[in-house]
């Protein structure tokens, strides 16, 4: 049997397709999501429906975004889904999640088993509509999850760490071995929950998110340089020091809170 053939579908490398097949892992994920029938839940990249089908059993409706036309057609024709499935056959990077939230008149819950090549750009895309999202559950490569959870002064800590931790509380749920998927990937995966902060309870309020984007981009684009050099076009050494940051530090030595303080100093 061809290792990339599963349930009559050839996994497409360009879409990063690895299908979740372990029933125990699937049950754990569904339990952690804990869906309610009336909620608006969106699954990104449902594939062959490993999560879609058990979720549909508990939902009045389920929205899915699937780029692969063959998989989209299979889901549309599935008898268990025909009365509940709302399918968007398109690139998730073109989806306006605020518009979807307005259409269904409530905040969104989002989940997905994300391929490595889209995980970072997709997270930044979702941040644009974060105010319309209740929570997110994602299966990611363990390396990416380590970056989301990383603390300052570590190798894994980078711009992604700062921006995710600014927007959300990051909660690891479970690690998933390669043999839980078909075809079997070469890496471990992990499931995480992202809980967006609300403005009134945000630990690091920023007046303009574009300023935080600018500061972190400048710092981490030249992460081996000192802040004196990487942020010299934005701040004087005195301004850095007044924020409690030594100009001789590098990007990975600065906490999320300190980046937010710097963003709020920009005019």
From Swiss-Prot:
Signal peptide: none
Chain positions recorded as S-adenosyl-L-methionine binding sites: 18, 20, 45, 66, 91, 113
CDD domains linked: AdoMet_MTases (cd02440)
EC numbers on record: 2.1.1.182
InterPro entries found in the cross-reference section: KsgA/Erm, rRNA_Ade_diMease-like_C, rRNA_Ade_Mease_Trfase_CS, rRNA_Ade_methylase_Trfase_N, rRNA_adenine_dimethylase, SAM-dependent_MTases_sf
Reactions this protein catalyses: adenosine(1518)/adenosine(1519) in 16S rRNA + 4 S-adenosyl-L-methionine = N(6)-dimethyladenosine(1518)/N(6)-dimethyladenosine(1519) in 16S rRNA + 4 S-adenosyl-L-homocysteine + 4 H(+)
GO CC, any one term: cytosol
GO terms assigned for molecular function: 16S rRNA (adenine(1518)-N(6)/adenine(1519)-N(6))-dimethyltransferase activity; RNA binding
Subcellular location: Cytoplasm
The protein's enzyme class: transferase
Superkingdom to which the source organism belongs: Bacteria
Record-stated family: Belongs to the class I-like SAM-binding methyltransferase superfamily. rRNA adenine N(6)-methyltransferase family. RsmA subfamily.
Function comment: Specifically dimethylates two adjacent adenosines (A1518 and A1519) in the loop of a conserved hairpin near the 3'-end of 16S rRNA in the 30S particle. May play a critical role in biogenesis of 30S subunits.
NCBIfam families: ksgA (TIGR00755)
Protein name (database record): Ribosomal RNA small subunit methyltransferase A
Native organism: Hamiltonella defensa subsp. Acyrthosiphon pisum (strain 5AT)
């Amino acid at each position: 049997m061809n290792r990339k053939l599963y349930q009559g579908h050839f996994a497409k490398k360009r879409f990063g397709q690895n299908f979740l097949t372990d029933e125990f892992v699937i049950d754990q994920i569904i339990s952690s999501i804990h869906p309610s029938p009336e909620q608006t839940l969106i699954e990104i990249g449902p594939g062959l429906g490993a999560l879609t089908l058990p979720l549909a059993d508990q939902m009045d409706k389920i929205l899915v975004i699937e780029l692969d036309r063959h998989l989209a057609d299979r889901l549309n024709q599935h008898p268990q889904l025909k009365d509940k499935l709302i399918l968007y056959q398109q690139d998730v990077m073109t989806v306006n999640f605020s518009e979807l939230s307005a259409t269904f008149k409530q905040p969104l819950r989002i989940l997905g088993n994300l391929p490595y090549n889209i995980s970072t750009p997709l997270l930044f895309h979702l941040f644009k509509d974060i105010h319309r999202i209740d929570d997110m559950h994602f299966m990611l490569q363990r390396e990416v999850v380590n970056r989301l959870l990383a603390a300052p002064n570590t190798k894994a800590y980078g711009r992604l760490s700062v921006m995710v931790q600014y927007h959300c509380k990051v909660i690891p749920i479970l690690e998933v071995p390669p043999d839980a998927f078909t075809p079997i990937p070469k890496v471990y995966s992990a499931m995480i929950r992202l809980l967006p902060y609300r403005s009134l309870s945000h630990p690091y309020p920023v007046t303009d998110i574009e300023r935080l984007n600018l500061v972190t981009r400048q710092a981490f684009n030249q992460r081996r340089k000192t802040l004196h050099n990487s942020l010299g076009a934005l701040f004087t050494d005195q301004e850095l020091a007044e924020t409690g940051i030594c100009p001789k530090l590098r990007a990975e030595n600065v906490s999320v809170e300190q980046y937010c303080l710097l963003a709020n100093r920009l005019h």
